[in-house]
Structures are given as structure tokens and as C-alpha cells.
Amino acid sequence: MKPLLLLAMAGLLACNDSGTDSGMDSGISQRRIFVTDTIQNGNFGGTAGADELCASQAAAARLQGEFKAWLSTISSPVSGRLTQSSVPYVLVDGTLIANDWNDLVDGSIFAPINLDANQQVRSGDVWTGTLPDGLPYMNDDCEGFTSDSAGIALCGTTASMNANWTANATPPCSTELRLYCIEQ
């Protein structure tokens, strides 16, 4: 078990926020993660369309807050699009996924990300375009996730707790997969 997890579980971990996102976690004790309940091919209007899908599903489930997709394009890495939080990332039921951003991008997570915004179990692959360290997969990205016919893109899997959660395979852009959504 990771040392920070033990401290957090014992209620002994104080949250100091002096990193690059200083102030962004003020008043926030955790950031929620879910997987979409719908599947779509690689053409969902780039990162903006993916973010809109996450926001829509969060709103439909009455989740407060801003949600964005865990999705990188070659020109827009997730590490530059999402809040790099110093608080834990959890599923919508409270299950711990990672202690903080650095833990999220260290190659393993504590539990599979397999619950949708309504806490229903969902399985399968997930469009990510993102390597385990939060940087983009540089070989192809379905033309910035705006094409369902050209190329391939990186996907993860909801069944994994190792690096495969975000970097598992490179299916054709016509494949219908889910997205991960993370509270900002």
C-alpha cells in the first residue's frame, strides 16, 4: 500500500498546496473521476467536444463542479489541459484512485476507473490519447479526435490498475469507446 494512502486513511495527512496549481484546490478535498456511459468513435469534436460530453453526463447525474475529459491530442496534452491537483482523485462512490496528480501519472492507480457518473459499472476500452505520464501519444490521434475514418489513437481500459488504464491499445478511429471524465 502506498504510504500517502495509509496517512490519508488514518486522517493524518494535511493538505499543503504550494505547487503549480496553488490555490486551485482551496476548499476541495477530492476530485471525482468517472467513465462515460456512452460510447463514440474517434470523432467527437476534439478535446472541446469530449469536455462537453463529460460536462453533460456530470450534469445529468447532478454532479456539481466542472468535468473535463482525460484526453490528449498531439498538440494538446492532458497534463496541460487539466488541473494538476494536490488532493485525492476518487471514483464517484468515493473509491480512491490516486492520492494526487503525481500519483495519478506514476503508472498505476489504486482501483479501476469503471463507474459512470451514476455509479453504474461500465467496462471496455476508453479513448485517452494519453501516455501514463500525462503526455500525448505522438503517433496518431484521429486527427485531433475529429475523424472517425483516418488513423488510430491510443486507448486505455477500465479493467486495469497499471499503465494500461490509460495506454492499452491503438484501435482504428472508427472504433466506439468510452471517455474518462475528471473533476477540475
Can you name each region flagged by the protein language model?
Residues 11-14:
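C-terminal motif of bacterial Sec signal peptides marking the signal peptidase cleavage site
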